[in-house]
Amino acid sequence: MAGVLCPTEEDRSIRAAVRMLPPQPCPDESGGYRRMSGPTLSQVQEEPAAETPQPPAPASTAEDDVRKRGYLRKQKHGHKRYFVLRSQSHLGPARLEYYDNEKKFRSGQRSGCHPKRVIPLYLCFTVSRRADAKNKHLVALYTKDEYFAMAAENEQEQDGWYQALSELINESKGACLDTEELEENYGTLRPGTVFKEVWQVNVKPRGLGQAKNLSGVYRLCLSSKAVHLVKLNSDVACVHLLLMNIRRCGHSENYFFIEVGRSSSTGAGELWMQVDDCVVAQHMHETFLDTMKALKAYSEFRPRSKSQSSGTNPISFITTRRYLGNLPPSQTGLQQRRARTETVVGTPPSAKNNSFRFRTSSEGEGTMTRPFRSVTGSLSHLNTARINLGKQEGVGRYVRAPFNSGYHSRSASLPVSHFPSATSPISVCSSNGHGSASETLTRPSSSSVCGSPSDGGFISSDEYGSSPGDLRYFRVRSNTPDSLGNTPPIQEENTLSDYMSMSAHSQPDSRDDYMEADKCFRKRTYSLTKPTNAASQQKSQTAVSLDEDSEETNKQFAYAESPKLKDSSHVEDYSNGVIDSVCNHSRRKASDDGYMPMMPSNSYDSDYLPMAPKSVSAPKQINSCPSQVDSKGYMMMFPVNGSPVKNVFGGAATKSNIEKLSNGGYMDMSYGNSIKQVHDSSLNNNSRGLSSYFSLPRSFKSLTKQTSDHSEYVPMSSPGKLLHLGAENGVDACTNGADHNVAKTELKSPSSTLDQQVKRPTKLMLGIRGSNTIPRMFDHSASAEPTSPGEYINIDFSDKASSTPCSLSAEGSPSSLGSSCDHRHSPLSDYMSVDIDVQSPKATADLCDSLTDISPYACTVVSRMQPNAEYAKLPCGTACVSKTDNRIDDYTTMTFNMAMTPPRSFAGETENGTKVDSPSSIVNRLCIGDLTSLNGGFSLPNPLPEPMAGPKVIRADSQGRRRHSSETFSSASTVTTSSSCFTESSKRHSSASFDNVWLKSDENCCEQENKMSRNCSTGFQNGLNYIALSMHDGVCEPTSPACHQHQNGSRILENGGYVSIDFTRSDCLKCPSSRKD
């Protein structure tokens, strides 16, 4: 019988007969063979025992290897069994046995009877304490093929068995620890692997279970760094998943799920596993969370990142691990357990041994020297010169490289053409109470960081929600795309306080010490001016997008200016250059607390960023002056006088003007050619009169060399005749009807003014292609916006201005100019008020014949009127229009009144002069006068023989196309590349749009206020949409100032998508005809 290994039928019959006999000293070996679930050591020992029967060993010898014994219940049915835990000895390996009762155990010791079940501990994956709905104190053993659990009576008994089993399992494993955890693919799981927890789960065919055919009963084995799925009773390879690949996990009732990233062996997806009950599912969830949080202790692992949009997250940094002097394994080629998203890039030798580095967002516990990518895909690294820039006393926080070191990378959201990888990996990990998160994102190769949609902003937090990063280590100069360039690294070895004072700097010397490092550091701002060199002109770039349609934008980029580039044409991108005396002042010893003060300062060493561009030609002449603040310490947002205006709009900078820079370099939005436009007292009085100058299309350029190409703002008033106060006009200069007065300005003689002042277009051309429009920046309206805007275009062809500058429409329309207080009188109409001073001595008789005698070549002197609810009252008495405040009509009447002839009225008048219009009246009165001409002004040549062509009024249907705010007069041949600056962001609450045009008849009328009636009924929403005027005469004067050609000699006017007016005569030069795209 000793040599028989496989039992036959005869053997089975013999065994059956032997069972009927009383117990013998030699147990039946075949019966023992049948009871065992697998080949164990007891089988091997029983076979030779049949040859040489021996008496049973004494009880003391048999119980020497017993470590623990006692009654426990089986989990499934609750049957009580007697369990014996044996340690490794000469009798066999460590094992767990159980008998029906203690009596059989003792009898078996004497008679050699075998236990009912033997579980070798070296085959067990792990032992764990469990609890379910029925049993609160379970001790579970897991092997590859089965799960065996025992229920203890109380927690102390549970802990005793658990500790004993754990010790024996660890002793039996030896050196078989974590040998397979380095695998990231499918493989076999060797028996004896130590796991923290093992669960028997039923993987459902859902998500990855269906895609990867993973459904069925599995062992879910959790170790300290990985999780394994072992198919029960199958030879299918195990699935190994690193904990770092798990994005999140959770449970729902009796289901536990895991979501893994795309770097896992199974790919991205979810695994849904069914367990016994919700208690087990909750325990699994909590155990996974605790294990993943404890993963921080392993230095070779770092937090994973979330695969989400990079533009939705702010920047932060992880500051847990630090490499001082040595690079991480990802930089030296020893990348064994680094994550898949780590990018290995070449690092120059100069950047390998330094104590200053960039903190990367793609590292969690580890780090690397992350370079910043430029537009061309080049990499800029740290330099060892940065080491010497830090302060040694341990208070400095920011360290910057000198500007001539070439580390200012221009970054923008443009594709990288010749770089191997177009993405830069970032790592983020987070966790909450119900799930862990660890995903992956790839950041576009853009270093623009302030949250623009196209830029690669990202977030990085500590592993599993430990702590977010700290933004204070990353100071961004502005949110322009080209502002990142050189981000200050972290000074690792300095002892810094974790808490900073949030109060304002009280010492004038309290500049950041990194200003001492780069003596001429300049802060970046939005580019508000253009370079003088026409070849190097570029469009302004905002943080939102880049103008990809412009070749100049794609070819030229503004770089951080070094001291060698002070005469460059790109200097206008910098504001508040800390130069000369400011740089000298910053060399003083100062204490740096690392925070930027949030309160304004009265000296130029405050950390506020002035918003004024500086002179391109002589940057050294500009010194930053103290900021204008009030008694409460708030920054005054008024424009300054003198030099900024002159420098911005092209004037020569004088010494007196530079010394008057009193507002810290804020942009003066007022008229740009007069030095004495605004007095300092206007700032003290909180004058709001200067708020009327807002951003207008940059295409309104000057015709003469005196105008500056830097100016991107165009005042709509007369360039040489700034609206002023004087006894001759008697009009208070105010915009909001308040007491804020603008100081008087000098008015030069008309002859010298036309030659010296900047010539601006008097007509706003519509629909010019290629035009750039800068949106309005501010709106200082007195009250809230009414229900519908009055969209004014107020053009005054006058040689003498008689009213103050008027702000843009208070209703928020960038296409309107005029008084914000008077707009509210009639919020339902969209006016275009053209006030023309006729300056031809022979105009009186000519105006009687035809309205077409009006020359389209008007004077370039433009002033903003203050419209009111009444028309301008002409002193000649022939074209006086009475008030219409007390009546509202849906129609307007245009009356053609001559200066020396009785008025021709389309509507009757009452005794007191009040208009009596009827709905049948379609045109409003057009008052035409005459003034003496001055230096090529508005000319009215000889009358024409043909009959008068009155104004043609086109009336639109109420359901038809409403008039656009930019569809106004387009008097076609004023030079300059005008653009349709009134085509965007206009609110049109009413289409009752009337074009009200009149000509003054006496030069004394400039002493009176020019007002216009804007009364319109709300009953008719289909107002005047177009008005066509034929305004050419027989002889066009070629010497008219408005007839100059473009700088390139061309008079071609580009046409937009709106209607322009064709002013032609058979015997006159033909202006550009109206076309409609």
Curated annotation (Swiss-Prot):
One of the record's GO molecular function terms:
phosphatidylinositol 3-kinase binding
**UniProt motif YXXM motif 7: location:** 666-669
PTM: Phosphorylated by INSR.
Q: Where is this motif: YXXM motif 5?
A: 608-611
Extent of motif YXXM motif 1: 33-36
- UniProt xrefs under Pfam families: IRS (PF02174), PH (PF00169)
* Gene Ontology annotations of biological process type: insulin receptor signaling pathway
Record-linked CDD domains: PH_IRS (cd01257), PTB_IRS (cd01204)
Locus of motif YXXM motif 4: 595-598
GO CC terms in record: cytosol; plasma membrane
The record's keywords, sorted A to Z, are:
Phosphoprotein, Repeat, Transducer
Q: Where is this motif: YXXM motif 6?
A: 634-637
Gene3D superfamilies to which the protein is assigned, alphabetical: Pleckstrin-homology domain (PH domain)/Phosphotyrosine-binding domain (PTB) (2.30.29.30)
Q: Motif YXXM motif 9: which ranges?
A: 891-894
**Which residue ranges does the record assign to the IRS-type PTB domain?**
195-299
Q: Which SUPFAM superfamilies match?
A: PH domain-like (SSF50729)
Q: What is the protein's known function?
A: Potentiates insulin signaling.
The name under which this protein is listed is: Insulin receptor substrate 2-B
Q: Please name the source species.
A: Xenopus laevis (African clawed frog)
